[in-house]
């Protein structure tokens, strides 16, 4: 009994015991508070690891970027050991992917100057440019930068064979991005591996003005794809942040889809 008691006490006071404080630098709320360098340094001095990855492979730099901390703070974090510019984080993405996601072109340029690779593909099959497109980035300067640094707008496609114009289609609000990508050489009638064109992808976003615009441009919208799917099916997918309402399906039905 005495031996069992000693073992229990050893476990109770072990640094791995459940009562141990977690790394505050992995707490997203901490980065929402926009901490100062002094606050960050204090946390590090108190034993919080500035380069630790959580169970989903996000680290303090990721959270600082995603919570819109000043670039000077982010640069400071990147300067710390273990936070190399090409460090692999969630979904095999490096910091420049998260900068792209947050429309943070100055940070993207800084990371590039530090040696950030521009030709990586994440674990879901998205290049840097296509990650920007599939997350709805509308700032063409982001894409200009990617193209300037070697991205191939006509050949970079995701695992489904979708180009950046198709990927961004659910998020477009007018013809700006359509004109932008077609001016770079993408054919508005391009399709993915299953034969889905821009109308199907736009249906995910449910913007009737955009779909009308595409119809007026002469794109196909009633046809079935190679697996007998159509715009109605794509509308049911919605996007990560929104689902289509009944009005979208009534609109598509009125088109004969």
List each model region and its residues:
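Bacterial Sec-dependent N-terminal signal peptides
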Residues: 1-26
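Ankyrin-repeat boundary/"N-cap" motif
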Residues: 21-31, 52-65, 86-98, 121-133, ...
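Ankyrin-repeat intra-repeat helix-capping/turn positions
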Residues: 35, 68-69, 103, 136-138, ...
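Conserved ankyrin/ankyrin-like repeat signature
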Residues: 39, 72-73, 106-107, 138-142, ...
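Ankyrin repeat domain, specifically the short helix-to-loop turn at the C-terminus of the second helix
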Residues: 41-49, 75-84, 109-117, 144-153, ...
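Long, acidic/polar, low-complexity amphipathic helices and coiled-coil-like
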Residues: 107-201
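Acidic, serine/threonine- and glycine-rich low-complexity intrinsically disordered segments
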Residues: 170-257
């Amino acid at each position: 009994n005495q031996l069992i008691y000693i073992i229990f006490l050893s476990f109770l006071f072990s640094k791995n015991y459940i009562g141990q404080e977690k790394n505050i630098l992995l707490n997203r709320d901490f980065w929402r508070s926009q901490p100062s360098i002094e606050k960050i340094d204090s946390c590090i001095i108190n034993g919080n690891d500035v380069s630790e990855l959580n169970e989903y492979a996000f680290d303090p730099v990721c959270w600082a970027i995603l919570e819109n901390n000043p670039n000077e703070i982010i640069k400071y974090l990147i300067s710390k050991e273990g936070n190399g510019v090409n460090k692999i984080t969630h979904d095999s993405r490096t910091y420049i992917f998260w900068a792209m996601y947050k429309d943070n072109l100055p940070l993207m340029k800084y990371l590039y100057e530090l040696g950030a690779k521009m030709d990586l593909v994440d674990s879901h099959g998205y290049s840097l440019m296509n990650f920007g497109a599939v997350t709805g980035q509308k700032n063409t300067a982001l894409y200009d930068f990617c193209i300037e640094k070697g991205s191939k707008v006509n050949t970079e496609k995701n695992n489904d064979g979708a180009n950046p114009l198709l990927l961004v289609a659910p998020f477009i609000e007018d013809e700006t991005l359509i004109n932008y990508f077609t001016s770079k050489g993408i054919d508005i009638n391009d399709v993915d591996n299953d034969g889905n064109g821009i109308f199907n992808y736009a249906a995910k976003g449910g913007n009737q003005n955009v779909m009308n615009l595409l119809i007026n441009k002469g794109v196909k919208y009633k046809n079935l794809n190679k697996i007998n799917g159509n715009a109605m099916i794509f509308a049911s997918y919605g996007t990560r942040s929104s689902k289509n309402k009944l009005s979208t399906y009534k609109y598509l039905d009125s088109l004969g889809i």
